[in-house]
Amino acid sequence: MQESLVETPANRYARQMALPGFGPAAQQRLAAARVLVIGAGGLGSSVIPALAAAGVGTIVIVDDDTVELSNLHRQHIHGVADVGRPKARSAAESVAGIDPAIAVEVHEVRLTAGNALELYAGVDLVIDGSDNFATRYLSNDAAALAGIPLVWGAVSQYAGQVGVAWAARGPQYRDLFPTPPPPGSVLSCEAGGVLPTVCSVIGSIMSTEAIKIITGIGAPLIGRVTTFDALTGGFRELSYERNPNCAPIDALIDYEVFCGTAPTVDSVTAPQLASELAAGGTVTLVDVREQWEADIASLPGSRLVPLGSLDDAIDGLRSAESVVIYCHLGARSARALDILRNNGFTSARQLDGGIDAWSRLVDPDVRRY
């Protein structure tokens, strides 16, 4: 075997251990660490391989989603051959390709209030790469109860932000954001898009924060948030302190209800809608996505009215007996439902989970993206 391929920490991590203040001791702390990563999507795809390459001993991956073709532009840990496969498994295989000595635990589940504390048990640090506020508040609260640090990040369009929540050392996510924004008010990647390189930048900073906390080098982003604007190429830092008005965290709650994203009487599930249509129900389906999305997949018989054009189309919908609005995942349909409600459509409903839920729960032939 060539000398350069002989597997020892000294040659694999030589350039890392040569850093001032790092050395073998810091490398050993990385090797002994157990890090849980929530999400193997846009942020997780940068975080997971970075942790593996740095030598984190055990990586726990939590993700219940599957790889879609539209994920690949920003989720570089997956490839074309992985489309349709569980993201957590695909990510685990990528780790093995970087360093087969890294232990990987795969949990093909969604983080919930029911499983969070069990998943956090025995973990040294959590990295939250999720894409919704309910999971961010849950990950913060569970980390506070477990007494471990949380590195969180978020991206949207051309910008992103990173912070560290650590109840024992400083303020938490709730101190920065005491209450969640109204549903649909913050554009998700689904609704507003995201530049893939923003995911890479933010994911790299998240990984760096994790390495700093584990090894004890540098000053973690405790009480500080770093923001990145890709359009200007600039970084900014915001400082914040503990919020004395925040109630202490003593239990996990229903985070969908807290964030206003739980299904309501104004929602219909995909199986329920399928049953209504099969029974001959008179339902007017209104698709509030964009044309390019409808070109990928749409529900039969639906009418395309992009959200930005909904006000102009209201009069044409007044004769409909029953209106059901849908989008990709549900954010835009919630905003559309508010518009219709304000214009007298008291019985209008939205499809819970959007066309993505229809594909998963009713008709797998409808393409996911």
Q: Can you annotate each of these PLM segments?
A:
Residues 1-36, 69-70, 254-263:
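N-terminal charged helix/coil linker that caps or initiates catalytic domains
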Residues 30, 119-121, 317-318:
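A short, aliphatic-rich alpha-helical micro-motif
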Residues 2, 15, 93, 226-283, ...:
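Rhodanese-like catalytic fold shared by cysteine-dependent sulfurtransferases
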Residues 84-136:
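A structured beta-alpha segment of the ubiquitous adenosine-cofactor-binding alpha/beta core
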